[in-house]
Amino acid sequence: MPVPGATVMTYAAAPGRACGSCTLCCKVYALPQLEKPPGVWCGHCAPGQGCKIHDALPEQCRRFNCLWMTDGKMPDEWRPDRAKFVLSLYPENGFVYGQVDPGSPAAWRRAPYFDGLRAMAKALIAERRHVLMFLGDDATLIMPDQALSLGKMTTRDNFRIEQVFGPQGPTWRAARI
């Protein structure tokens, strides 16, 4: 499993990677330019086939950086249409954000994904970066030892984490600020 902290932010597909029949980003993200809310298929998407206006994509679509596409070491089972969530590196803070298909809200909690997300979180925390999974605007912070619900959030909201020590050893707490 690759470590996102070692991944160079790029919008270019890794060698051998292509969207193919994957169109999940066309469902899970809001597209304000097209007045498309999150969680519903874009009217220009042919699910499982691709975009019908690919030559005239909105800027948000052209600039999107699907982590599976840009990280050639990420296993094939992490391709968004298989995993049922889309991971990306948020350019402003380097966090890994996942947007979950509302038709499969617990997909990221299944094997091998939850353990992989926790491994990413462990690698990123030393860099003060984090992994957040979103179902719509409900955010869950993935920590090395657990998943912490943060409630409704946007990419502009902030949170604070702290390590605490208990009878089972160190763990984490998070709070919105």
Give each language-model segment a name:
Residues 1-177:
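Short loop/turn segments that flank or connect secondary-structure elements
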